[in-house]
């Protein structure tokens, strides 16, 4: 996998919830769903290159899949990895496109 491919596959999508919305307003922390192979350095490099911002810190956690039932069949949702990315002072990522 080339370095450009790895950058594009590292950050999957922003994770939007009430908690993450509050974090982005309060202390410029953006939350992303990232690839299972990604580590802190990979996420930092990908966000800095893709969004042209300066990253101050990255915290990563694994989210376990939840048990689900489909009638008699028991299953699980897939596990995924979440990254809390704190941006440096004066930097911001605008996903909506409004100014």
Curated annotation (Swiss-Prot):
This is Large ribosomal subunit protein uL23. It comes from Francisella tularensis subsp. holarctica (strain LVS). Belongs to the universal ribosomal protein uL23 family. NCBIfam families: PRK05738.1-3 (NF004359), PRK05738.2-4 (NF004363). Coiled coil: none annotated. PANTHER family: 60S RIBOSOMAL PROTEIN L23A (PTHR11620). The gene is rplW. InterPro entries: Nucleotide-bd_a/b_plait_sf, Ribosomal_uL23-like, Ribosomal_uL23/eL15/eS24_sf, Ribosomal_uL23_CS. GO terms for cellular component: ribonucleoprotein complex; ribosome.
């Amino acid at each position: 996998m080339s370095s450009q491919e790895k950058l594009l596959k590292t950050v999957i999508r922003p994770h939007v919830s009430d908690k993450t919305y509050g974090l982005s307003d309060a202390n410029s922390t953006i939350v992303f769903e990232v690839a299972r192979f990604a580590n802190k350095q990979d996420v930092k490099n990908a966000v800095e290159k893709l969004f042209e911002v300066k990253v101050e810190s990255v915290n990563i956690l694994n989210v376990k899949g939840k048990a689900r039932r489909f009638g008699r069949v028991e299953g699980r949702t897939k596990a995924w990895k979440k990254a809390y990315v704190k941006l440096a002072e004066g930097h911001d990522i605008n996903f909506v496109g409004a100014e």
